[in-house]
Amino acid sequence: MKPLSSPLQQHWQTVVERLPEILAEATLSVQAKSVLTFSDFVQDSVIAHPEWLTELESAPPQADEWRHYAAWLQDALAQVTDEAALMRELRVFRRRIMVRIAWAQALSLVEEENILQQLSHLAETLIVAARDWLYDACCREWGTPCNHDGVPQPLLILGMGKLGGGELNFSSDIDLIFAWPEHGSTRGGRRELDNAQFFTRMGQRLIKVLDQPTMDGFVYRVDMRLRPFGDSGPLVLSFAALEDYYQEQGRDWERYAMVKARIMGAADSAYVDELRAMLRPFVFRRYIDFSVIQSLRNMKGMIAREVRRRGLKDNIKLGAGGIREIEFIVQVFQLIRGGREPSLQSRSLLPTLSAIDALHLLPENDAGQLRAAYLFLRRLENLLQSINDEQTQTLPGDELNRARLAWGMRTDDWSQLTDILAAHMANVRRVFNELIGDDETDTQEDTLSEHWRELWQDALQEDDTTPVLAHLSDDDRGRVLALIADFRKELDKRTIGPRGRQVLDHLMPHLLSDVCSREDASVPLSRITPLLVGIVTRTTYLELLSEFPGALKHLISLCAASPMVASQLARYPLLLDELLDPNTLYQPTATDAYRDELRQYLLRVPEDDEEQQLEALRQFKQTQLLRIAAADIAGTLPVMKVSDHLTWLAEAIIDAVVQQAWGQMVARYGQPTHLAERTGRGFAVVGYGKLGGWELGYSSDLDLIFLHDCPMDVMTDGEREIDGRQFYLRLAQRIMHLFSTRTSSGILYEVDARLRPSGAAGMLVTSAEAFADYQKNEAWTWEHQALVRARVVYGDPQLTSQFDAVRRDIMTLAREGKTLQTEVREMREKMRAHLGNKHRDRFDIKADEGGITDIEFITQYLVLRYAHEKPKLTRWSDNVRILELLAQNDIMDEQEAHALTLAYTTLRDELHHLALQELPGHVAQECFSKERALVRASWQKWLVAG
C-alpha cells in the first residue's frame, strides 16, 4: 500500500481530533488511518457507527461478498413492520455496504470491475427488497393484482443506464422504468382496484421509500424520466402500452438508452422472458443500421453544447476523451451491428468491448487502449465520489482532494496523475473522432489575403483599404472602418487571455472577409460586434466560430437579416451552437414533436435541481425561437406556420412547467384525495388571446386561466396535508413563479391571468363549476368575446370536455342582435380611445382602424351573433378558421371571408417581420391601404349598419 503523502499526513491530525475515544489512534491499523484520511464519507460513517470499523478490520471486504447482500438485507428487514422502519433499515444498510466498498476501493483490495459490480448489485438488492416488501403490503391493503384469468401480476422494474449495465458509479442516481404484464383488477381486497391504479400507487410508494430524504439520508435518487412520455406519461405501463410506444414512437435516443436496460431481480419467468423478447427488436435491428452514426453524432453535439453551456472544466465524464465518449464508441457498434452479432448485445461495456476486439471492428490495440482508459477513468470517478459520497465528475481544484486522488490512483503526485489522465483521454478522443467524426471538415489553412489580416490589426492606412472594400460606397467604407476601430477599443477594456486573443486574431480576418464581401457590410458588422464583445472572455464560443466556417456564415446572414436574432445571440451566446447544423437551424421542430424534444432536453438536467430546470426551459425556448426565426427569414415558413410553431412551443413549455410545479407541490403536500379513484390531475390551463387562437408572435405574452375540479372538503394525502382547493391555488401560484422567475436566460414568458373570473380581483384558480356559473351569470360581453379565442392548452380530458361544453353553451346563447352589435362596437371604440395611436402619421397595424383588432372583433361578433343558429361556428378558436366557418355556414359571403383572411394574414406577416427587425408595429400611413379599406367596409357592414 502506498504511504500517505505529506499533505495527507498533515490532514490526518485533523481527522484524529474528530475521532471519538472508542476509535483511539493507537488502536487503528495503517489501513484504517489511510482510508479515514482519504474519505470524509467513511470517516463520518464510522464515527456514527464505530462497530462498522471493527467489522472492517476483522472481516475486510471480499471480491465476492456481493453474493451475500440479499441475505444480509433480508436479515436486516426481518423485524420491519411499517414503511418508516423499512426506509430506515434500507438507508442504514446502503450506507454500511457503501463504506465497505469505499474501503475496498481505496485500499485496492478488489479489481475496479468488481467495484462496479458491487455498486450495481447493491442498488439492485435494495430496489428489489423494497419492491417485494411493498408489493406484499399493498396486496394486503388492496388485494392482489390479477389478469382476467386470475393470474397474479408482478411489478417489473427496468434498471437503465449504468445500473442496467452493472456499471453503477459510487454516488449515482438510478434511472428506472416500471411495467406490469396484463390488465385486470385486484382480488381479495376490501374493494377492487384496476391494475393500473394498484401499480401506480405502489410505484409512488416505492419511489418515496427509495428517494425521500430522512434523518438517515436517502437510498438512491430515483429518476423516472426515461419512461415513455417522460413526466407526462403514466408512472407504470402495461406490456401492451410499452410495446405500442416503442413500436410507434420510440426515438433514437430511447433506443440508445434501452441497450443497457435490465430487469431488476429477474428470476426465470414467462413475464420476464416476454418483456425481454418484446424490447429486443426495438434495440437491435436485424439489418446493419448505419443511420445510428448520425444519431450518435447528434448526441455527441448535444453533450459538447452542454459542456459549453455549463462551463464544465476538467470533467472526466463529459469532457473530450471522457467516459461518455468510450460509451458512445461501444454503443455505436452495438446499435449498428448488434442485430446480427449476438456477442455485441451485452449490457455491460467491457464484455462488449472484448467482443468488438474479437470481431476486429476496431484497429489493433485500440480496444486495449479503450479498456485501460475506461478502467482508469472509472476508478478515478469512483474515488472522487467516495471522498464525500458526492455525485461529481469534475476534478478538484484544492490541494487536499488532489493529494487524496493522487494517493488513491497510486501516483506520486497530482502532476503525474494528470499526465497519465491526459494520455488516456487523448487515446479515447482519437478513436472517437476516427469512428464518429464530425459533419464539419477541419478548418482549412488560412489562405486569406494579408489585407484582411492587416485590416483587422489596424495596419492599413485608409487609402490602402480601397482594394478590399472597393465595392462599398465611401460612406459605407467609413462605417465599416469605424465599427472595426470601435470594436478594438471595446476589446481594450476587456481582460482577454493569450488563448482568447489568439483565437480572435484567427477569427476576425475570416469574419471580415465574409462580411465585407456583402453590399450591406456595415449592417451585419454593426450587429455582430456587440455579440463578439460579449463572448471574448468565453474562448469556447470564439473557437466555435473560428473552427466552423459554416457557423460563421450562418451568423453573418442571420444577423444581416434580423437585428432581433442578432440581439438574441448576443444575450444568449449558447444559441451559437445552433449555427453548427443547418439541417436543424432552418428546419424547426415538427409541430407535434416539441413536447418530446423538450422532454429529451430536460433529461440532461437533474430533476430535483430547480435552478437548472428553470435555466434549461429558457434555453430550450430561446433555441427553438432561433430556429423558427431562421426558417422565417429563409422564407420556408409562411406566417400561419410561424404562429403554429410558436404556439406549439408555448404549449410544450406550459406542459413542462405544470409537470414541474405539480411534482414540487405533491412532494410537499401529497395529492388531493379525490384523485385516488381516477387518472389525471384534476387541473387545466386555458389559453386565451393569441395563444388560444394559434396566433402567437415572437414576443407575445401568454393569457392564461387555471381551472380545477376539486370538490369542497377534500384534503391532500401528504404528511403536510392541506385543503385540496388550497393545493390547486398554490399549484397555480407556483406555475406563475416558474414562468416569471428571471434567470441568466431571462424569464420564460410574461403571463397575464387577468382574464379569469372577476379579473385581478378574482381567485387565481377557479373550479370548473364556478367558472361556468360566472360565465352564465356575471360575465360581460367582452368576456364572452374573449371566450371565442379560448381553448384548453393543458388538462385532463374530463376537465377539457367540461370547459368545451361551457364555452359552447355560452357562445350559442341567443343574443339580441342590435344590443350585441352596440356592445361590441363600443368596446372597440373604448379600446381605441384608451390605446390611442401616438403616431398620427403612422398606421398601427394592430390597433388602428382597419387593422388586425378590427378583424378579430368582426369574427367574435359574428360567432356570438349566429352560433345559436349555427353551433358549428364554435368549433375553432383562431380567426382564419372562424372566417372559413362563417363562409361555410352562409353567414359571410365567401369572397368577403377570403379577402378578410388575406388581409389578416398579410398584416400579421408584416408584424412578424417588423418584430424580426426589432421595429414597432406601425408603418407609413399609405401602407396597406387596400387591406384597410376592405376591413373598414366589413366593419361598417357588420358593426355599424342597422
UniProtKB/Swiss-Prot annotation:
Enzyme class: transferase
Keyword annotations from UniProtKB, A to Z: ATP-binding, Magnesium, Multifunctional enzyme, Nucleotide-binding, Nucleotidyltransferase, Transferase
Catalyses which reaction(s): [glutamine synthetase]-O(4)-(5'-adenylyl)-L-tyrosine + phosphate = [glutamine synthetase]-L-tyrosine + ADP; [glutamine synthetase]-L-tyrosine + ATP = [glutamine synthetase]-O(4)-(5'-adenylyl)-L-tyrosine + diphosphate
Organism ancestry: Bacteria, Pseudomonadati, Pseudomonadota, Gammaproteobacteria, Enterobacterales
CDD domains according to UniProt: NT_GlnE_GlnD_like
Name of the protein in question: Bifunctional glutamine synthetase adenylyltransferase/adenylyl-removing enzyme
Organism: Citrobacter koseri (strain ATCC BAA-895 / CDC 4225-83 / SGSC4696)
Region (Adenylyl removase): 1-440
GO BP annotations, alphabetical order: regulation of glutamine family amino acid metabolic process
Purpose of the protein: Involved in the regulation of glutamine synthetase GlnA, a key enzyme in the process to assimilate ammonia. When cellular nitrogen levels are high, the C-terminal adenylyl transferase (AT) inactivates GlnA by covalent transfer of an adenylyl group from ATP to specific tyrosine residue of GlnA, thus reducing its activity. Conversely, when nitrogen levels are low, the N-terminal adenylyl removase (AR) activates GlnA by removing the adenylyl group by phosphorolysis, increasing its activity.
Magnesium as UniProt keyword: yes
GO MF: [glutamate-ammonia-ligase] adenylyltransferase activity; [glutamine synthetase]-adenylyl-L-tyrosine phosphorylase activity; ATP binding; magnesium ion binding
InterPro entries xref list: GlnE, GlnE_rpt_dom, NT_sf, PII_UdlTrfase/GS_AdlTrfase
Gene expressing this chain: glnE
Keyword Nucleotide-binding: yes
SUPFAM superfamilies named in the record: Nucleotidyltransferase (SSF81301), Nucleotidyltransferase substrate binding subunit/domain (SSF81593)
GO cellular component terms given for this protein: cytosol
Cofactor: Mg(2+)
Superkingdom, taxonomy of origin: Bacteria
Region (Adenylyl transferase): 449-946
